């Protein structure tokens, strides 16, 4: 288990990252391109909020399927419920203190085409 934390430490989650860190992604939707977050997809049951549930705020837009979660104190985006698979979260790898952010760029980072998502309203 690893800890996923916002910048101020008010929101903390335990996450199960399975065996190794790979299959990282970035999304190019209008929200994610502004955040620039590197994500790892995990099953919903592999994330448990252990501190600050009342500090977590949600942002939704367009189809209002995906949910982008952030800390109401520091604004850190911690994770999101994915619209392409609502049984999974995209976790912000930058919120895991044990992982050096520079190490993330050594992995292949897949780009997901959120700009042309089939569920988007046309």
Q: Across the structure, where does each feature detected by a protein language model lie?
A:
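A short Gly-Trp-Pro
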Residues: 1-5, 10-122
């Amino acid at each position: 288990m690893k800890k996923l934390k916002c910048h101020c430490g008010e929101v903390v989650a335990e996450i199960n990252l399975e065996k190794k860190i790979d299959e990282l992604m970035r999304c190019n939707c209008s929200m994610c391109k502004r955040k620039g977050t590197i994500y790892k997809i995990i099953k919903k049951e592999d994330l448990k909020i252990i501190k600050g549930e009342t500090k977590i705020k949600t942002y939704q837009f367009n189809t209002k399927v995906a949910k982008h979660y952030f800390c109401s104190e520091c604004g850190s985006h911690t994770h999101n419920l994915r619209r392409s698979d609502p049984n999974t979260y995209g976790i912000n790898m930058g919120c895991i203190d044990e992982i050096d952010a520079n190490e993330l760029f050594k992995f292949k980072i897949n780009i997901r085409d959120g700009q042309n998502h089939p569920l988007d309203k046309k």
